[in-house]
Amino acid sequence: MHPPAVSLTRFLRHSIAALLLTLAGNCGIVQAQQKTAPAQEKPKIRAITAFINLDRAQYQQQVADALKMLKRAQTVFESRGYEVQTIRISTQPFPEYTKGLTKEQAVEFFKQYDALAAKEKFAAAIGPAMLNAGDSEAQADLLAEILGNTKTLNASLVVAGEDGVHWAAVGAAARVMKKLEESTPHSQGNFSFSAIAMVPPLTPFYPGSYHTGFGHQFTIALESANVVAAAFKGAPDLSTAKQRLTDSLAASAFDIERLAGRVDQDTGWAYMGIDLSPAPLKDVSIGAAIENLTTQPFGTSGTLTAAATITAAIKDVKVKQAGYSGLMLPILEDSRLAQRWSEGRISIDALLSYSAVCGTGLDTVPLPGDITAEQLSLIIGDMASLAYKWHKPLSARLLPALGKGWGEMTEFDNSFLVNATLQPLDRK
C-alpha cells in the first residue's frame, strides 16, 4: 500500500528542513573551530643534505652526481611550495681520505674543494677530525689549519660516543676553537666548527654533519620556528600547545617525506629521514615562540617546561626522524635569544639544564675573547658528560670573540648571526 501523496510531500519537506538545520549547525561548528585553531604555518626546508664517500681521485664527479640529485630534490620541494634555503654535501671523516698527504697537501686539497663548493653554491662538511677515542690529535691541529684557510667548509670533533667521553678530543676541540678565534676574520671560523657528542651519522644540520657508510644517501632539515610560534599562540594549556605543535609539524612532515620518497625513487639516492628540530633564523625566533607559551621572558621559570613540551611534540611525529630532532637554542642565530642573552637572562648552565630535556646543547654561544683553552674544555666536557649520561645528541659551537670582554658587543659579520652583549663566564 502506497502512502498518500500529501503525506509523502510533508515527509520530504520535514526531512529536507532537518537536513538543512543539521548542515547549518555543522557549518557553525567548523567556523568556530577555524576561529580558535591557529592558522597552518608552513616550514621552510633549511637544508637538503647529500652524503658521499669522498674519493680524492674522483671527487669532482661525485660532487656533480650529488648536485644532480640535490637540484632534482630542490625542484620537487619548491613545486609544492617549500622554500629550500641550502643544498649541502657531507662526507665521511676527512682523515679517511687524506691519508698519505702532508699537512700542506691536505690544506691545498681542501682549498680546491672549498673553491668548488663556492662555485657550485653548495655548503660542505668534511666530517670529524677525531671520530673515535684514541684518534690522533694531530688531525685536530690539521683541521684548524683547514678551516682557517677556507670559507665554506664545516667540520667537527666527536667528544663523546657509546664508549663514554673522549677527553683527549675535548681538549683538542678547545684548542681548535682558540686557534680559529685568533686566526679568522672577526673570529668567525668557529661558526663552522663544533664539538659533537652522541650525534648520529646522517644529521643534515651543520657543522656536525657526517656519515660512516657508503654514502649515496640524503636527509632533510627544517626551519620551523614559525610553526612553533603559531601552535603556541593563544594555547590555553600545555597539552593543547603540544598537540597543536605535533599536528602542525606532522602535516608538513608527512608531505615532505612523501616527496622525499619520490626523489629516492627518481634518483636512486636513499632517503634516510628528516630532522624535525625547529631551527630558527634571526627574527623567525624560537625564543619568541617559547615566550608565546610561557608569556614570560625566555630564561625565567617555565622555560624548561616549554622546552620539554616542544621536544615531546617532535618525538610524537610519526615520520622517519634523523639527526637531533629536538629543540635548538642557537643564541646568535635567534634575535630573541640574543636579546635575552644580552640582558643576562640566559647562561651556559641554564642552556645545559634545558639540554637535559631537549637539545642541541650549546649553539652559537658568544664568549669573551680572553677565555682560555682550559676554560673552553671545561664547558665542552660538561656538554659531553650530559650527552653521554642521557644518551642524547648534543654539541658545543662556542664563539669566543677576540679582543672583546664582558659587557662589550660582539662584531660578527655573518648574515646568519645576530650580535649580542658578552656576559661574564661566572655570574655571581
Label each PLM-derived region with a short phrase:
Residues 15-26:
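Bacterial N-terminal signal peptides
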Residues 28-31:
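Sec/Tat signal peptide C-region and signal peptidase I cleavage site
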Residues 33-428:
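Anaerobic metallocofactor- and corrinoid-dependent redox/one-carbon enzyme cores
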Residues 1-16:
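Bacterial N-terminal signal peptides that target proteins for export
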